[in-house]
Structure formats: structure tokens, C-alpha cells
């Protein structure tokens, strides 16, 4: 059998609480009840009313009716005792509910024949809890002896003075001395109560300890199999990446920073002439966006200032490019249009070197062909459309066309 070395989990504690196995410091609850009763007794137990009832009965000359006499005493007892009993019951119920975390032990109400098992009874008889209770009983005997000694030293004059007290004050003095004796006993027993609660808490968690196999099995039951959940996460990530890939393929160009930020820009003049952000990724996802764009022939422009500005001014994906960044985006689109016209072999536009705000062509030719058919430009593509591979406007094209390149930052 595996050794139980693991602490009980939250689910284990909840299941045990439903079975009635909760941490119970019964002596602390008893201390609260006794202290509440001792403090409330002088205020709730009205001896004057009891004495007045005796005087009333004695003053009647005729023989009282036994039934009416018993009913009157019952009413008086309820008026005096009912508030006292209810207060003590509430003082005992509230700490018990707090200890059980307001969990109702429904399963403990059922009739369980295993509680009559003599083997389990012998185990309980020679358990650590039984040894703890035996030691606690001996400590309480010592506490009671100490309480009597201290009480005798403090209040012996008041006790012997009862012989000379007036009869009307005897009841009140007895109540006061009794309350003092009870409170003194509780004060002397407080260290034993705290020690008992600590040992009880230790034994409670010791009984509910679990082995590693139980912890793993409970995790599988509550959270699901780890391998299945990992596969689900991978599938979910693949679904998300497919959406991002589609956005990359439909973008006019990707502006990078150069490895930490990737911003996709899409323009559809038929709908609205303002460009908007189609992709907005950082770090590892930004690198993946750049690789996928290069594989699909989507121009990748490396412009640190523009990428950072768009990332800062456009905090959400599918939002329009801010007014401060439109000029830089339009410069890139114009430059890409010039590159596309040169690649198609048409009449080249007025060639010029890109300004500092425009990207420069980086060395290295992108893979030939278009890996994403949806992004291939037809022969009648408008001049403002983005090129599948961006090149430098100064690069001549062999056989009437310019090689496709990706842009790089010059600033």
C-alpha cells in the first residue's frame, strides 16, 4: 500500500465535509457556550420574579389549584429559561457552523452499519485520538485543582461571608461567585483548549492525507485527462492560427519591427479608402506571421518606426489605421504599386529612390511563385493593389520583370 504523504486537496476536504468529517474543536465550542451562559445568567435569570411568585402563593389564604399552580410555574420557567437556552444554543451552533464552513453533512444522517463494526471500534479505542483524549482528561483534572486553589485564595472571604449575608442577597451572591468560578476555570483551561485544538487539527489532516496516485486520479476525474486536454489545446491553437493565416494571406502587406511586432495592413477602396489593421501580433507570433507572409508572397516591409507607431496607435485588430500613420502606410502602398508595375513588365512609373519614410529592398529574392493562390494578382489588377512580393524599384527585372523582394527599413 502506498504511503499517504500528500496533503488533502480541496475536493477531498469538501467530500469529507459532506460525510461529516470536518475539523471540530469541541472543547472550544463548549468553552464559548459555558462563557456565554455564565455571562448571561445574571442578566436573564431574574431571581426577584421567582421570589415574588413565592410571596404571591404564600399570601393566598385558600389552597391553590394544583393545575393552575403548575401552569403558572411553567409559564414563569419558560419566560426565564427560554431566552437563556436559546442564547446558549446559538453560541454553540455558530462556532460549529464556522468550523464546518457552513457545510451540511447530509450523508452522515444516513444509517451506516459499518459504525457497528467491532474491528473499527477497536481501532478507534487504540488510536491517536483516544490517547489524546486520555491525556486531555488528566490535564483537565489538574486544571480543576488549580482553579479551586486560586478561587479559594481570591474569594475565601466572600464565601465565608455568606453566613452573615441577608437572605435577600444570598441568591445574587451565589450567582456572582459561581460565574467567577466558571470564568476562572475557563481561563486556567485555555492553554489546554488551544493545545487540544492544534492536535485535533493535525489528526484531522493526518486522517485525510492522500497518496500520489489518489491525487493524480482525482485530478483526472475533476480536470480531465492531461493528454486529452493537451490535444484539445493544440487543436484550439491550430484553429486560431488558421484564422491568423487567413488574415495574413488577405493583407496587402506586413510591416515588421523586425522580429517583435508584425502588423498586417489591408485596404479595400471599394468599401472604404482608409486602411485598417488585419493582423496584430508580437514576439513568437510575429515571427510566425512574417514566415507565413514570405511563404505566401505577401510583402514584408521592415520599418521599425511605422510598425511601432501603428501598434501603439491601433490597439485592436480590425481597427482603422490612425490619422498619424496614414501617410506612412500610403507611402508603402505607392512604393509597392511601383514594384508591381515593374514586375508585370508594363510601362514603369517615374522611378525614384524611396525616401527615409519608405522601405528599402532587402537582399535576397523571395521564393518564386505564389504559395497562396488567393493573393495572386491578376493581369488587370489595379495600380494601387499590393504586390505579392515587394522589391526595390531600382532592381531591373530579367525577361521583362523584376525579381520579387521583401522590403527592409532604411531609417
Curated annotation (Swiss-Prot):
It comes from the Bacteria. PANTHER family: FLAGELLAR BIOSYNTHETIC PROTEIN FLHB, SURFACE PRESENTATION OF ANTIGENS PROTEIN SPAS. Residues 341-411 are annotated as: Disordered. GO terms for cellular component: plasma membrane. The keyword Transmembrane applies. It comes from Burkholderia pseudomallei (strain 1106a). This is Secretion apparatus protein BsaZ. The lineage of its organism: Bacteria, Pseudomonadati, Pseudomonadota, Betaproteobacteria, Burkholderiales. It is found in: Cell membrane. Its main location: membrane. Coiled coil: none annotated. It is a multi-pass membrane protein. Residues 370-404 have a biased composition (Low complexity).
Amino acid at each position: 500500500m502506498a504511503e499517504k504523504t500528500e496533503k488533502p486537496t480541496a475536493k477531498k476536504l469538501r467530500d469529507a465535509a459532506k460525510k461529516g468529517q470536518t475539523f471540530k474543536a469541541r472543547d472550544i465550542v463548549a468553552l464559548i457556550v459555558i462563557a456565554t451562559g455564565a455571562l448571561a445568567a445574571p442578566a436573564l435569570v431574574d431571581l426577584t420574579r421567582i421570589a415574588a411568585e413565592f410571596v404571591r402563593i404564600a399570601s393566598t389564604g385558600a389552597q391553590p389549584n394544583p393545575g393552575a399552580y403548575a401552569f403558572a410555574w411553567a409559564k414563569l420557567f419558560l419566560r426565564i429559561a427560554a431566552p437563556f437556552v436559546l442564547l446558549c444554543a446559538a453560541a454553540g451552533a455558530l462556532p460549529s457552523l464556522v468550523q464546518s464552513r457552513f457545510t451540511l453533512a447530509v450523508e452522515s444522517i444516513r444509517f451506516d452499519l459499518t459504525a457497528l463494526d467491532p474491528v473499527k471500534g477497536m481501532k478507534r479505542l487504540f488510536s491517536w485520538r483516544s490517547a489524546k483524549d486520555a491525556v486531555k482528561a488528566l490535564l483537565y483534572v489538574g486544571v480543576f485543582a488549580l482553579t479551586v486553589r486560586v478561587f479559594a485564595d481570591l474569594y475565601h472571604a466572600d464565601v465565608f461571608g455568606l453566613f452573615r449575608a441577608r437572605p435577600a442577597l444570598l441568591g445574587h451572591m451565589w450567582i456572582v461567585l459561581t460565574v467567577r468560578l466558571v470564568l476562572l476555570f475557563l481561563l486556567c483551561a485555555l492553554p489546554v483548549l488551544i493545545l487540544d485544538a492544534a492536535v485535533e487539527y493535525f489528526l484531522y489532516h493526518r486522517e485525510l492525507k492522500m497518496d500520489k496516485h489518489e491525487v493524480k486520479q482525482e485530478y483526472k476525474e475533476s480536470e480531465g485527462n492531461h493528454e486529452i486536454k493537451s490535444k484539445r489545446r493544440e487543436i484550439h491553437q491550430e484553429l486560431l492560427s488558421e484564422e491568423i493565416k487567413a488574415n495574413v494571406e488577405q493583407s496587402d502587406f506586413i510591416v515588421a519591427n523586425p522580429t517583435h511586432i508584425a502588423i498586417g495592413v489591408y485596404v479595400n477602396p471599394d468599401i472604404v479608402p482608409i486602411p485598417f489593421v488585419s493582423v496584430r501580433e508580437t514576439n513568437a507570433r510575429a515571427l510566425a506571421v512574417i514566415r507565413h507572409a514570405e511563404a505566401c508572397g505577401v510583402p514584408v516591409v521592415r520599418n521599425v518606426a511605422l510598425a511601432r507607431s501603428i501598434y501603439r496607435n491601433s490597439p485592436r485588430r480590425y481597427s482603422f489605421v490612425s490619422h498619424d500613420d496614414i501617410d506612412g502606410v500610403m507611402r508603402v502602398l505607392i512604393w509597392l504599386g511601383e514594384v508591381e508595375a515593374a514586375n508585370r513588365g508594363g510601362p514603369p512609373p517615374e522611378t525614384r529612390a524611396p525616401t527615409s519614410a519608405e522601405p528599402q529592398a532587402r537582399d535576397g529574392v523571395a521564393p518564386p511563385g505564389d504559395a497562396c493562390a488567393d493573393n495572386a494578382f491578376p493581369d488587370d489588377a489595379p495600380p494601387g493593389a499590393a504586390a505579392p512580393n515587394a522589391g526595390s524599384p531600382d532592381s531591373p527585372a530579367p525577361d521583362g520583370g523584376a525579381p520579387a523582394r521583401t522590403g527592409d527599413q532604411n531609417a
